[in-house]
Every structure is written in C-alpha cells, then in structure tokens.
Amino acid sequence: MKQWARLIIIGACLGSSAAEAQTTLDKSKYGYSYFTLGFENVVYEELFPGLDSDASVVSPVLNTGGLYHINTRFDFSIDALATFSPISATEEWHKSGTLIQTNQFEYLKAATNILLHYKLQDNWRVLAGTSLGYQTYKRYGLKNHNGYVNDVFREGNTWEEKSTDIFLDAGLAYDSGHLYGESDWRVSGRWVFGVPIWSVTENSRFEDIQFNDFGFRTNAEATLSYQIMPGLHLGWFVMLGYEKRFESDPQRVSYTTASGVEKQGQAWLPEAQTWTLNTGLQALWNF
C-alpha cells in the first residue's frame, strides 16, 4: 500500500512538472507580429461658411507592429503606419454650389499607436493608450473658375500644410492574443476613439504661424486570416476611419495678394472631415 502511495505521489509530481512545462510553452505562443501591405483611400473635406472643398486621394500603405504578452490580465500592442507615393487628385472648391477653384491635392500620413490591453473575458479586451500622428496636405496647380480670384493663394503657387498630433485613445478589441487556435481560421478586430491632447498645424504660405486645433477621431478594423503553417497566418485587413477637426482660433498673418500688394489679415484652419478606407494583405507570425 505504501508503494502505491509513493507511486501516486511521484506521478502527481511528474504531472505537475509536465503541466508547468506546458504552461511555459503556451506562454511562449502568446503574442504575434504582423505586416500589412495595401492601399488607403482618403476623402478630405474643408468647410468654410458658404464655401467647401473635397478631394479623394489613393496611396499605398504599409502597416506593421505586434501584440505582446505581459501576463494573464494585460497585453500591449504597437502599430506603425505610413502612406507613400500618393496618386495626385483634383480638389474642387465650391461657393454656394458654384465651382470657383480647382487644384491638385496630395495627402500623406504616418502614425504610431501604443495601446494597453486589459483582458475582460475570453477574447474581449478594453484598450487605452496614446498615438502620435503626422499629416501633410500638399496643394499645387491652382486654377480659378467662373470669375473668382483667390487673393491669398495665387495661380501657380504650391503650398503645404503639416499637422502633428498626439492623441489619447480608448476602445474595445476582440483578439485571442495568439495564432494557435483550434480552427485554422482566425478573426480579430478593434474599435478605437481618440481626442487630441496636442495638435499643431503649420501652413507654408504663412511663415512662423502655428494653428492649434481640436477635434476627435474614431476607427474600426478587422482581420480575417488562415493558418498556412503553425505560427504563420495570411489574411485580409480592413479599416474604416473618421476624423473631425473643428475650426481653429484665428491668427494674425501677413501675405502678398494676387496683385502684389502686401497686406495683413486673419487666417484660421477651417472645419474639416476625413474619411479613410484602408485595406490590404496581412501576414501574422509567431515562431
């Protein structure tokens, strides 16, 4: 009887050691890295009283990052995105419905997002973090229409706006946190809402002037992937985003009119809206 008891104790110890080894192995499988190559379509609108503009720009986009395991309650993610080689689009300006100006428009952006994940239950997570964004809006090839003359931005001018933003973000995510599920198919997604805590925009037309603005943004994204081999998935990524910028406070500026006269006046950032569709092929791995 004592021998059987010893065997049971030894078996329990061995089983415990095996379980610990399995737990350690499982922990090594948590988290993953990813790389996305795709295209981004941006629809941008500016809204002045009685005056509005719109443009739609397409550009290639790279998105890379990963999800990193901390413990049973927390993970964190880092995402870095950049667009490049934008396809120039025509921006149209209308006053009370009448076309008054067109110009070529290019849009580029780069962003880095860091989020802490709190695991609620199963695959559901609460997100909180921050992000840094940099956007450029380039305009050139201005043409006036229907007798309108732009007194600030003249035909033949090229001008560029550069915006730097720091956002506080919060949201909700659905993610298993690993690539080793029972099914070969895997679904993940997240929704994030953010407000800027620091936002500065400069326009090359007005030297040494900075515009401070406020607004909000939100986006929803999802990935559907299939396991090619253990630890490697290929899939498709889709993200829909919306950003709102409110009109900024006016700044005192100096400029040269279309007729060559030096003048002073006020300038401000108009209310603006940006819709974004980002989609592409995504690879995820953990080896």
What is the role of each PLM region?
Residues 39, 62-68, 82, 112-118, ...:
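Residues on the lipid-exposed face of transmembrane beta-strands in outer-membrane beta-barrel proteins
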Residues 41-53, 88-98, 137-149, 197-209, ...:
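Outer-membrane beta-barrel translocator domains and adjoining extracellular loop/strand segments
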Residues 151-214:
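Short helix-loop boundary/capping segments
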Residues 211-287:
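Predominantly the C-terminal beta-signal and adjacent terminal strand-loop region
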Residues 31, 54-62, 84, 104-112, ...:
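Residues that define the transmembrane beta-barrel architecture of outer-membrane proteins
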Residues 22-31, 68-77, 116-126, 177-187, ...:
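Short loop/turn motifs that connect adjacent beta-strands in outer-membrane beta-barrel proteins
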Residues 21-92, 269-287:
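Short glycine/proline- and aromatic-enriched beta-strand/turn motifs that initiate or cap beta-hairpins
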Residues 85-173:
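Outer-membrane pore/translocation modules
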